[in-house]
């Protein structure tokens, strides 16, 4: 079983490589992804929904960079938290934001829950730029 740190490092690499197969390799069969805050009105997704969201937005981003600022591991709760800066070139200009990812691990080392907090103001502004082009 890979360590939680190694698993999360693999996910960071998969973001930068834009590789959804690598990104979802360590998730469990009962995986749930949640994009927050709730004001975005995005419901929980299973792995198929997560893959669909990734594939639908993948083409917007070029020179994608996911850079970890800090991590926190709670061994007792089988949880890791990641704070990162994200930058990318897009056809509507430079994109830059911060994200917080929370990964919940089961007893086999698989991720069963992934919560992603995004800067909703940046996300909404980016959506408006995409719609206005």
UniProtKB/Swiss-Prot annotation:
Pathway(s) annotated for this protein in UniProt: Mycotoxin biosynthesis
Superkingdom, taxonomy of origin: Eukaryota
Gene3D superfamilies on file: 3.10.450.50
InterPro entries, per the entry: Fungal_Meroterpenoid_Isomerase (IPR050977), NTF2-like_dom_sf (IPR032710)
Biological function: Part of the core atranone cluster (CAC) which products are predicted to catalyze most or all steps of mycotoxin atranone synthesis, starting from geranylgeranyl pyrophosphate (GGPP). The initial cyclization of GGPP to dolabellane is probably performed by the terpene cyclase ATR13. The Baeyer-Villiger oxidation near the end of the atranone synthesis, which converts atranones D and E to atranones F and G is predicted to be catalyzed by the monooxygenase ATR8. Of the CAC's other predicted gene products, the reducing PKS ATR6 might synthesize a polyketide chain.
Protein name from the UniProt record: Core atranone cluster (CAC) protein 11
Organism: Stachybotrys chlorohalonatus (strain IBT 40285)
Gene that produces this protein: ATR11
């Amino acid at each position: 079983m890979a360590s939680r740190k190694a698993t999360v490092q693999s996910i960071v690499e998969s973001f930068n490589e834009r590789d959804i197969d690598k990104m979802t390799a360590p998730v469990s069969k009962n995986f749930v992804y949640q994009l927050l805050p709730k004001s975005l009105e995005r419901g929980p997704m299973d792995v198929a929904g997560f893959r669909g969201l990734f594939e639908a937005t993948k083409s917007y981003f070029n020179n994608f960079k996911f850079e970890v600022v800090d991590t926190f591991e709670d061994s007792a709760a089988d949880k890791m938290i990641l704070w990162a800066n994200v930058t990318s070139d897009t056809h509507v200009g430079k994109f830059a934001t911060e994200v917080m990812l929370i990964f919940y691990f089961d007893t086999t080392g698989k991720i069963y829950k992934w919560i992603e907090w995004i800067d909703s103001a940046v996300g909404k502004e980016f959506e408006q730029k995409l719609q206005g082009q």
